[in-house]
């Protein structure tokens, strides 16, 4: 098992927030991300052609909270192509901007516990770490989904204790921007 690194680092963090029709939760999510980070933190929102006022709410929140992030961008896709295409477009954008820090991807409906982002960030003081994931705290009554996700969570944790896992929890995960190449 890996021990949590004791040394610190100040690698820049880009929070990648893919959204689609998140009007009911987007302000709560942005408030959730409004924390004091001991490293430069920017925000990239990629909207997959929302038909509600999600983008307007994001822009208004950023206008009202200009000092929360070092930099912020909102990319609006002209048509809905799904989360995977949105994330790929965002990563291509970061590549074009020569971004070389860490990327935290999080879902709009996923709340993040206090200290989680700083803890995930801390793992990267070990240069052998390429990606880390968090443990989801799901608030659902769908027992089939909960059982299914619990099984994968148990498998992922067991694999991580042995060496590494082949999949991460998509609602909150972080990786080195140079961990892999995105083909345009």
Where are these regions (language model features)?
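Cell-envelope/extracellular polymer assembly enzymes that use nucleotide-activated donors
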Residues: 12-14, 42
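Short aromatic/hydrophobic "clamp" motif used to bind/position activated sugar donors
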Residues: 103
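Glycine-rich, basic loop-to-helix element that forms the pyrophosphate-binding segment
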Residues: 77-97
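Acidic helix N-cap motif at the loop->helix transition within catalytic regions
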Residues: 24-28, 52-61, 87, 115
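Short, acidic, metal-binding catalytic loop of nucleotide-sugar glycosyltransferases
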Residues: 31-40
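N-terminal membrane-anchoring/stem segments of glycan-assembly enzymes
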Residues: 1-9, 159-160
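A conserved acidic beta->alpha catalytic loop
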Residues: 47-58, 79, 110
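Conserved donor NDP-sugar-binding/catalytic core segment of glycosyltransferases
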Residues: 114-146
């Amino acid at each position: 098992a890996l021990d949590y690194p004791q040394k610190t680092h100040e690698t820049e963090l880009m929070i990648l927030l893919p959204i689609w029709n998140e009007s009911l939760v987007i302000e709560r999510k942005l408030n959730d991300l409004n924390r004091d980070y001991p490293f430069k933190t920017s925000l990239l929102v990629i909207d997959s052609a929302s038909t509600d006022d999600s983008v307007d709410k994001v822009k208004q929140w950023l206008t009202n909270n200009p000092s929360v992030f070092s930099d912020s961008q909102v990319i609006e896709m002209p048509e809905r192509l799904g989360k995977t295409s949105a994330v790929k477009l965002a990563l291509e954008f970061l590549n074009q901007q020569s971004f070389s820090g860490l990327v935290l991807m999080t879902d709009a409906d996923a709340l993040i516990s206090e200290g989680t982002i700083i803890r995930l960030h801390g793992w990267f003081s070990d240069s052998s770490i390429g990606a880390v994931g968090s443990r989801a705290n799901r608030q659902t009554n769908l027992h089939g989904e909960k059982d299914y996700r619990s099984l994968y969570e148990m498998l992922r944790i067991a694999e991580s204790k042995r060496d590494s896992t082949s999949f991460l929890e998509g609602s909150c995960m972080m990786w080195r921007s140079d961990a892999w190449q995105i083909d345009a």
